[in-house]
Amino acid sequence: KDQQLENQQLAQKVGIAVGALLLLSLALIAVTLWRMRRAQARLTANQSLLRAQSERDPLTDLSNRRHFLAVMDQRAKDIDRRADDDGFHGALMMIDIDHFKNVNDWHGHAAGDAVIVEVARRIRAAVRDTDLVVRWGGEEFLVFSPELPGADLALMADRILRSIGGTPVETPEGPLRVTASIGFASFPLGGSGGAALRLHWEQAVNWADMVLYKAKAEGRNRGVGISAVDAPDADTLAAILQDFDAACLNSQVRLKLLLGPA
């Protein structure tokens, strides 16, 4: 009997020890899983932060050119998968701060940064929530507006001109008058006979940049947009870009002019 009792007690002790070991093992596994999940969450958060930082301009917190290129590449892939592929759709606006080099040279880089930040804020406030505002580089910005008709695009460009140039920008060196030049176009461009002319998004950016150059060449503090293009095909469009001024003079390209605040 004594031996049997001892065996039972020993079995109980072994059972308790095994149970304790199992509980300890489960606790260790739970802690390990929790730590792994926390590490994975930190890794995911860090990756998201790095991705966001790589796609944002640190000064203005706008999208940067890299983000815009990624968005356009994805849209191009989506278009290529569709049967009704007729190229880039949407409106583009290129915005350049007038005489920005003078701001840096005469008032310093702190004033220049203040101007960049405030102009970015005014652009963002003047567009729709669905529009993508990009710091394109230096003092230049790009706005991509999906599904925006040409008439509404002109209204938006006028709103941005007046927002930027309407009131001085406060800087560490005091208030500065700032104006901008804008080039804008809605795509696809209408060809002769009403047919839509297919363009890749990079070509669309070139057209917006071309009318921005026109706005700057004609005096700045203004917007120039494309109202109509007389071109039967893509080859004619390419030829127009080679001599844009001549195409405007002979009315192959008809422009819309917006004047900024006096």
Per-region residue spans from a language model:
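Cyclic nucleotide signaling catalytic output domains
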Residues: 133, 181-218, 224-250
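Signal-transducing coiled-coil linker helices
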Residues: 1, 9-58, 66-78
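Conserved nucleotide-binding and Mg2+-coordinating catalytic segments in signaling enzymes
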Residues: 50-70, 95-109, 117
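Alpha-helical scaffold within the catalytic cores of cyclic-nucleotide enzymes
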Residues: 120-124, 152-170, 205-209
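Short regulatory alpha-helical coupling segments
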Residues: 49-53, 65-88, 120-128, 146
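A short pre-motif secondary-structure segment
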Residues: 125, 132-135, 176
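Hydrophobic framework residues that shape the active-site pocket
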Residues: 96, 100, 119, 133-136, ...
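Active-site-proximal structural segments of metal-dependent nucleotidyl cyclase/transferase enzymes
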Residues: 71-107, 123, 134, 258
